[in-house]
């Protein structure tokens, strides 16, 4: 019977990705699921001049010698950013053109995803472990093709997948957000997307819904309230539900055995909606901490066990 390790919202943290891959052996799991928003959000330029590199991280400008730049690049990747060595002239090009910035980020980001797929191919070879990735609303569409080419990682988006007698459906799309991200749409369209998969599930008692967005008003979707200028209200202490009504409706109607979510980093938890166990393991990728859920499944007993872990 499958033992699932589920993590989400790694946002480019290579430390978290390595921990994710190592979790199969550490926790004796045979299925790894990365639930969305796997890519980083920014490039950190390392400007090469006079035998050293200058860079800015966390508002601090620092210098490093050519001999130490590799260690700095590893540190940047651990925090979820993409290091990029540039000349002063190249930095000026990036500063002057939004199109150059966008094109450069996309290529560096895709190179980063390829790096992760290569790591997965190396670490999972010969283990029999199945690994699934379902890009989330923050991930650009070109990411999908990189994942499709991987040998040991399977793309989850839009598919029904059999996992030892359990049927998993997956989507990284979300309801609308204030940030106009890559994979978001109206609740109506999201409902159609989910129904297209869920309607094909033969038995909800052995169904897993891997849906990046958590269900509305489930307790797994509480995010700090923001104003019209995208600033935190009341110092971030005011929370409001921002989950998807389409996801909530799908869970209420189909009642799958298990639903896996992410998207809202602060809303870690596990709740039951009818017969469905819904889990959001949360995310602390900035700290290099991998937050996850381990779920043991049995075709007769359903959910044998589950545990929220971090490390």
Where are these regions (language model features)?
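Active-site-proximal beta-strand elements of phosphoester/diester hydrolases
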Residues: 2-11, 165-177, 208-212, 277-283, ...
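Divalent metal-coordination and catalytic microenvironments
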Residues: 9, 17, 32, 37, ...
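Active-site environment of divalent metal-dependent phosphoester hydrolases
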Residues: 11-15, 39-43, 129, 133-144, ...
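Binuclear metal-dependent phosphoesterase catalytic core
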Residues: 12, 160-164, 181, 185, ...
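Catalytic phosphate/metal-binding cores of nucleic-acid and nucleotide-processing enzymes, i.e., regions
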Residues: 14-19, 27, 161, 204, ...
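Core catalytic region of metal-dependent phosphoesterases/phosphodiesterases
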Residues: 15-163
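Active-site-proximal segments of metal-dependent phosphoesterases and phosphodiesterases across multiple
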Residues: 99-110, 114, 208-255
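Binuclear metal-dependent hydrolase catalytic cores centered on His/Asp/Glu-rich metal-binding motifs
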Residues: 166-207, 231, 237-245
């Amino acid at each position: 019977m499958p033992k699932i390790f589920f993590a989400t919202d790694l946002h480019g943290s290579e430390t978290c990705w390595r921990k994710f891959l190592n979790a199969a052996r550490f926790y004796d799991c045979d299925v790894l699921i990365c639930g969305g928003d796997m890519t980083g959000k920014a490039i950190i330029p390392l400007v090469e001049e006079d035998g050293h590199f200058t860079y800015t991280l966390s508002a601090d400008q620092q210098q490093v010698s050519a001999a130490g730049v590799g260690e700095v690049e590893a540190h940047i990747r651990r925090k979820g950013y993409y290091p990029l060595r540039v000349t002063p002239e190249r930095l000026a090009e990036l500063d002057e053109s939004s199109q150059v910035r966008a094109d450069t980020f996309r290529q560096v980001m895709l190179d980063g995803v390829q790096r992760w797929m290569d790591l997965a191919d190396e670490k999972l070879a010969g283990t029999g472990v199945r690994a699934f990735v379902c890009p989330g609303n923050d991930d650009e569409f070109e990411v999908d093709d990189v994942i499709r080419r991987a040998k040991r990682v399977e793309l989850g988006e839009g598919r029904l997948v059999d996992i030892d007698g359990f049927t998993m459906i997956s989507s990284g799309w979300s309801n609308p957000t204030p940030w106009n991200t890559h994979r978001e749409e109206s609740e109506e369209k999201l409902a159609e997307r989910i129904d297209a998969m869920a309607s094909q599930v033969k038995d909800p008692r052995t169904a897993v819904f891997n849906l990046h967005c958590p269900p509305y008003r489930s307790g797994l979707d509480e995010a700090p309230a923001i104003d019209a200028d995208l600033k935190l209200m009341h110092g971030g202490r005011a929370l409001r539900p921002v989950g998807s009504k389409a996801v909530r409706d799908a869970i209420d109607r189909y009642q799958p055995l298990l639903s896996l979510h992410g998207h809202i980093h602060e809303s870690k938890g596990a709740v039951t909606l009818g017969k469905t166990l819904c889990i959001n393991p949360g995310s602390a990728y900035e700290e290099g901490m991998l937050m996850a859920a381990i779920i043991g499944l049995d075709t007769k007993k359903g959910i044998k066990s589950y545990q929220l872990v971090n490390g």
